[in-house]
Amino acid sequence: MLASVALAALAGVGTPHATADDASPLVPLVDAAAQRLQTADPVAASKFRSGGAIDDPDREQQVIAAVTGDATRHNIDPGYVHDVFRNQIDATSSVEHTRFAQWKLDPAAAPSSAPDLSESRQKIDTLNRTMVDEIARQWPVLHSPVCRPDLDRALDAVATARGFDPVYRHALEYATHSYCR
């Protein structure tokens, strides 16, 4: 709840102190990417508890096919969307690998239970659609000279509002590093 309030304030919604210069139009896209990254913990817990592999090339291909199809329907470059989601998947997978390593080194920190993987995947699929919608909405910004400063402001706002630790902050930076073209 606090993160939502902070993000709304950072985006200039409902706050008299925000100006057009304060808000980045990329906050909704970056926040969707951040929420998608945050699925790494429950997904890692599910895979850790079940003995499943972190990397799932078949699932990754399904995701890429779905988002590039959505890109085509939005009349935006599917190659661009492919690159964005490849980075997002790699960042999320890296967080999962980090969690596995932490739990291997400290078994007491390992989760004693985990949500069903299908629940996390439904959330991921919804966030994927949101991200493609936001990419389409922000296409002109993503391909303009103001993209980098807008992205930097959005990254700072979202990472702060979500209380990201260094692992998640670096993962978010990686997930978004190809946004500006």
From Swiss-Prot:
Substrate binds at R36, K47, D56, R59, E60, Q61, Q62, V63, T92, S93, S94, V95, E96, R121. Keywords: Disulfide bond, Isomerase, Secreted, Signal. Homodimer. Residues 21-100 form the Chorismate mutase domain. Its EC number is 5.4.99.5. Disulfide bonds join C147-C180. The keyword Secreted applies. One of its GO terms (cellular component) is extracellular region. It is found in: Secreted. Catalyzes the Claisen rearrangement of chorismate to prephenate. May play some role in the pathogenicity. Pathway: Metabolic intermediate biosynthesis; prephenate biosynthesis; prephenate from chorismate: step 1/1. Residues 1-20 form the signal peptide. The keyword Transferase does not apply. GO terms for biological process: chorismate metabolic process; salicylic acid biosynthetic process. This is Secreted chorismate mutase. It catalyses: chorismate = prephenate. One of its GO terms (molecular function) is chorismate mutase activity. Its main location: secreted. Transmembrane segments: none annotated. It comes from Mycolicibacterium smegmatis (strain ATCC 700084 / mc(2)155). NCBIfam families: CM_mono2, PRK09269.1. InterPro entries: Chorismate_II_sf (IPR036263), Chorismate_mutase-related (IPR051331), Chorismate_mutase_periplasmic (IPR008240), CM_dom_sf (IPR036979), CM_II_prokaryot (IPR002701).
